[in-house]
From Swiss-Prot:
This is Protein yippee-like 5. PANTHER family: PROTEIN YIPPEE-LIKE CG15309-RELATED. The modification Phosphoserine is found at residue 118. Coiled coil: none annotated. GO terms for cellular component: centrosome; extracellular region; ficolin-1-rich granule lumen; midbody; mitotic spindle pole; nucleus; tertiary granule lumen; ubiquitin ligase complex.
Length: 121
């Protein structure tokens, strides 16, 4: 196996894999905390990095039928949640391309503030 290249999304509040601490996303990408996964509470994010994706699966969920892929950590292969590929109901289309991370499988921590130098420095 070759080298694994990981991305870093930056931000002041970071979400990382609970198993290996690989950075996945930040607080500014959070859309909703009102989701439920197999392990309990789950969060919907706009952009998540450092993921591996399973094959597409047809699942019937509480909100209807969806085409989804399970997502796991690119670094350690731990399951983290899923990504919505397609929603059959118009009211659920906002989820398409968005990622669910299960709260029990990720860790939230302090990130860092990026200071961009000004012309006066």
């Amino acid at each position: 196996m070759g080298r694994i290249f990981l991305d870093h999304i930056g931000g002041t509040r970071l979400f990382s894999c609970a198993n290996c601490d690989t950075i996945l996303t930040n607080r500014s990408e959070l859309i909703s905390t009102r989701f439920t996964g197999a392990t309990g509470r789950a969060f919907l994010f706009n952009k998540v990095v450092n993921l591996q994706y399973s094959e597409v699966q047809d699942r019937v969920m509480l909100t209807g039928r969806h085409m989804v892929r399970d997502v796991s950590c690119k670094n350690c292969n731990s399951k983290l949640g899923w990504i919505y590929e397609f929603a059959t109901e118009d009211s659920q289309r906002y989820k398409e391309g968005r990622v669910i991370l299960e709260r029990a499988l990720v860790r939230e921590s302090e990130g860092f503030e990026e200071h961009v130098p000004s012309d006066n420095s």
